[in-house]
């Protein structure tokens, strides 16, 4: 089975949801393509995944993120950047950066983490997603 994910928000919740779902899926022999677009692209920038913050509540964003990360660590989860590396190392998960978003946000290929499989446009990603059983939007 194959799934496709679109990560369009740069917050911690969407990042962790996509990581945990693809990590679980890879253990079940499920392949996944994850397309990072708009603010989600920031998660693929070097250091970006570890800087991601929770979305709500805005007044507690920094403290809430710190508490959430500590709880995840306590139950055995690693830093988001390490988890991204591990899901790619399974050989079942591929990370894709959006060409248009990179141009709009002036992001260069060298700004991205090494785990990015490639830089593709929406049409290319839709071709990839055409044979996916489900497309999940984060």
Annotated model-derived regions:
Residues 17, 44-46, 106-109:
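Short glycine-/acidic-enriched loop or helix-start segments at secondary-structure transitions
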Residues 4-9, 65-72, 109-111:
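Short, basic, glycine/proline-bearing loop/turn elements
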Residues 40-53:
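N-terminal beta-loop-helix "entrance" segment that forms/cooperates
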Residues 53-82:
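A glycine-rich helix N-cap at a beta->alpha junction
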Residues 135-138:
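Short hydrophobic/aromatic patches at helix-to-coil boundaries
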Residues 1-40:
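Long, hydrophobic N-terminal alpha-helical segment
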Residues 77-123, 127-133:
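A charged, amphipathic interaction segment
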């Amino acid at each position: 089975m194959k799934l496709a994910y679109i990560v369009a928000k740069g917050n911690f919740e969407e990042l962790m949801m996509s990581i945990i779902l693809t990590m679980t899926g890879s253990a079940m022999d499920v392949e996944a393509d994850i397309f990072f677009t708009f603010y989600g692209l920031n998660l693929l920038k070097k250091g970006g995944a570890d800087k991601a913050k929770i979305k709500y509540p805005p007044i507690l964003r920094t403290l809430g993120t710190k508490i959430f990360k500590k709880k995840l660590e306590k139950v055995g989860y690693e830093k988001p950047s390490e988890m991204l590396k591990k899901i790619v190392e399974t050989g079942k998960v591929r990370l894709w950066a959006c060409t248009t978003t990179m141009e709009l946000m002036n992001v260069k290929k060298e700004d991205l983490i090494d785990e990015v499989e490639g830089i593709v446009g929406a049409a290319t990603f839709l071709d990839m997603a055409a044979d996916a059983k489900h497309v999940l939007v984060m």
